[in-house]
Amino acid sequence: MLDFIGQANKKYNFEEKFAALLSNTTHSVSREIKEGFVSAPKGCYIQLEKIATKYVLDNISTSYDRTSGLVVRAASFTEDTGLPLTLGNFLDYYHLDPRAIYSKKLCFARLCVCARVVDDFAEPLEETLTKAFARFAVVDSRRWIRFLLDLLPKLDDTNFSQLSPIEQRMLQMFYVTIWGKAAEDWNSEEVLDNLYALSDSSVLLGELQTLLQYRYDHIDFIDEPVDVGFDCPLDLHCTYTRDQLLVALDFPKPATVREGVKWLPEKQLDVFFVTLNKADKDYSPTTMYNDYSINENLFHWQSQSTTAENSATGQRYIHHREKGSRVLLFVREFKTDSRFGGAAAYTYLGTVNYVRHEGSRPMNITWKLDRPIPARFLKKTNKLIVG
């Protein structure tokens, strides 16, 4: 097929057109164009002439890659579309991921101020919340979102220490997402000041609620609770940052976890953090573990290089059912988000059970998942699938 690209209208959305052809990539459309569309579907080939490439890259750069392009679109949004300028309308009309805004360290309310379509504002937590919005932009747990949407409008009237254990865990997940550490005491002055200050940032708090509702409305899979031996708020196949999932498991210092495994003796849980595609610059030869799904029910996992099969840890992996412990599997494709920046979040694949192993230091273990990997994840987790 031949397509002739000339000086298109500056508001024409080339990025959307090419993104529709590249659903399998984690890279930006601009990067795909520059690298020759390496993520095009199997059997497809996309070639742009030099001048056409420049037109398309310039269009994308001035439209969405730069803050200035977003500001221009916000300024004329209602005139161009006939729709009120809201976060949801803006994202849906331009087919944007919320992180296209929040990765630029910009909140939507500030974007609208820059576009001169709303009055300026000054709020104490603007910088703090704006940094957190990119992390909230990937939240996809219905249970957690419902809890937050119920809690946020009544922060000033809530006794946080009186919340149920599972509600306090969900609040911890919220707290660590914004302030980067767990709350040690719900009655401490620092914690209360932080939470109550949210009500003094009404514009940003309102945007957070809007973002959460937007995420809730766009969840396209069925999640469900996972039995881990206590009332845990983590739901199957949902996305969590390392800090969020660790505080949900009652581990209060997530920043201290540097390895891809964590044993929680009080909960009798082994937690595995798996990065499927490891870059040489991010991992040493001793941490380039070979992890992948064999099929929808089995997962191949390589232990740390120091773990021997006859060690206490190795024996716990092999005999976890007899010993009464559980193994939780969290998986991500890459360490960093190459499109929007920052650490990539993990998908919760649930509990797994030992099947067999080979070798020692490291151990190559095959695990059976209690719930099968959904088809939409399987292509990313299974290195044996081509195209």
Which sequence ranges carry the predicted segments?
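SF2 helicase/translocase ATPase core recognition
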Residues: M1-F14
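Acidic, glycine-rich low-complexity segments with interspersed aromatic residues
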Residues: C114-V118, A122, E126-A134, L234-A345
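Charge-dense, extended regions
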Residues: Q168-V271, N277-K278
